[in-house]
């Protein structure tokens, strides 16, 4: 290797180290063993091109991170939705840990900028490839778990993932009306009634407001582009209120 290329490699290395420092500052996560952090972002193509150096790719960390992510998301959903059936919990978890969701999170955190790639993978757009980014997110979770345990993983997810669940980002896979019905029937509280209380907007862009009541008492209000969507959002609000009341008792 010429002195010039050795200097270039060294410069690249220090630049990458600086990037990882900035990244840790930005997400308020500081690794005790930074080798694990670097490994989480090391693609197999990079290792193949640097065989003389002791680099490890992120595939084993990805395997571990997948399991850790499923566990932490499962724990959160189990506690948050006491009335939700096993089938619905499974569907919701699948929507949260599916590739498009993980890719969206990886983009939000600029994971693609940090990935160590081989030249061939780089030239074919690997840095933006969805499967690669989803794998890196899982590998990062695996690395964080190995470095610090389950609690810091949950703290990280509390900032970047759980609020999205709370804000209804995955509500398209949830049937809140059925959940509310089951919750009310289980406690023998009576029957629910849905009513469209308001409609507005032109015919091609209508917005509906729905109210769900129990024994004439309004429980939740929701809006949507269709009557069904508005009713689902009303049921979601009602369910959240009932569950909050239940946990206080």
Curated annotation (Swiss-Prot):
Alphabetized CDD domains for the sequence: DSRM_RNAse_III_family, RIBOc
PROSITE patterns from the UniProt entry: DS_RBD, RNASE_3_1, RNASE_3_2
Subcellular location: Cytoplasm
Catalysed conversion reaction: Endonucleolytic cleavage to 5'-phosphomonoester
Binding residue positions for Mg(2+): 62, 135, 138
Entry EC number(s): 3.1.26.3
Domain of life: Bacteria
GO cellular component: cytosol
Residues forming the catalytic site: 66, 138
Major location (coarse): cytoplasm
UniProt keyword annotations, A-Z: Cytoplasm, Endonuclease, Hydrolase, Magnesium, Metal-binding, mRNA processing, Nuclease, RNA-binding, rRNA processing, tRNA processing
Record-linked HAMAP family: RNase_III (MF_00104)
Its job: Digests double-stranded RNA. Involved in the processing of ribosomal RNA transcript to yield the immediate precursors to the large and small rRNAs (23S and 16S). Also processes pre-scRNA (the precursor of the signal recognition particle RNA). Probably also processes some mRNAs, and tRNAs when they are encoded in the rRNA operon. Probably processes pre-crRNA and tracrRNA of type II CRISPR loci if present in the organism. Involved in degradation of type I toxin-antitoxin system duplex RNAs.
NCBIfam families: RNaseIII
Name this polypeptide is given: Ribonuclease 3
């Amino acid at each position: 290797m010429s002195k010039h290329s050795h200097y270039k490699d060294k410069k690249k290395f220090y630049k990458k180290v600086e990037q990882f420092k900035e990244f840790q500052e930005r997400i308020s996560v500081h690794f005790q063993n930074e080798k694990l952090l670097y490994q989480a972002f090391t693609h197999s193509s990079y290792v193949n091109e640097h065989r003389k150096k002791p680099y490890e790719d992120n595939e084993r960390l990805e395997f571990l991170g997948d399991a850790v992510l499923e566990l932490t998301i499962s724990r959160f959903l189990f506690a948050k939705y006491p009335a939700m059936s096993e089938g619905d919990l499974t569907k919701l978890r699948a929507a949260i840990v599916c590739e498009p969701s993980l890719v969206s999170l990886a983009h939000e955190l600029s994971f693609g900028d940090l990935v160590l790639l081989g030249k061939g993978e780089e030239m074919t757009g690997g840095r933006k490839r969805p499967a690669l980014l989803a794998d890196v997110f899982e590998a990062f979770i695996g690395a964080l778990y190995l470095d610090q345990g389950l609690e810091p993983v949950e703290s990280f997810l509390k900032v970047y993932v759980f609020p999205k669940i709370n804000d209804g980002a995955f509500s398209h896979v949830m049937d809140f009306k059925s959940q509310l019905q089951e919750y009310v029937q289980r406690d023998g509280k009576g029957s629910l009634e849905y009513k469209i209380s308001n409609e507005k907007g032109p015919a091609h862009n209508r917005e509906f407001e729905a109210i769900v009541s129990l024994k004439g008492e309004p429980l939740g209000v929701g809006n949507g582009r269709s009557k069904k969507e508005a009713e689902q959002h009303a049921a979601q609000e009602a369910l959240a209120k009932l569950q909050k009341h239940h946990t206080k008792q």
